[in-house]
A protein has these predicted regions:
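Domain-level signal for Mg2+-assisted phosphodiester chemistry and nucleotide/NA-binding surfaces
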Residues: 1-71
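Nuclease catalytic cores that cleave nucleic-acid phosphodiester bonds
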Residues: 41-130
Length: 130
């Protein structure tokens, strides 16, 4: 049996540095039997944020890249296809999606994708079937 995966999006990697919440620990508590993953295109988006911004965003993107490259997270070699947006690709590859992006959460729920998100800047909530 294949293990279930939580796909972490770009803005969710920024949560620890915006709200001082350990997303890895919280996701592992909320979804203990799930593997934490992120697609390579999310890593590339974080690299772009680091390269093209200054100040806090640049620092947070750098820290998010270090977190994404930690041993707890598997980076999947998944590419964008046919001018696909990052959000469209995340919806294509996710059964459980960790995001704080309001529009992406709505689109995911409409497609029946379970969403993990930060609530009250303190803890992670799971919305959908697990």
């Amino acid at each position: 049996m294949e293990s279930k995966e939580v796909v972490i999006d770009t803005n969710f990697f920024m949560v620890p540095f915006q709200f001082n919440v350990d997303i890895i620990d919280e996701l592992e508590k909320a979804l203990p039997s799930y593997k934490l993953t992120t697609p390579i295109f999310v890593i590339n988006e974080l690299k772009g944020l680091k390269r093209n911004n200054k100040g806090k965003i640049r620092l947070n993107a750098d820290l998010a890249l270090k977190l994404a490259n930690s041993s707890n997270i598997e980076i999947k070699d998944i590419s964008l296809v046919n001018n696909e947006t990052v959000d469209d690709a995340l919806l294509r590859v996710s059964e459980v999606l960790a995001t704080n992006d309001i529009e992406l959460k709505k689109r995911a729920r409409k497609k029946g994708i379970t969403v993990a998100y930060l609530r009250q800047k303190k803890y992670i909530v799971i919305d959908g079937k697990i």
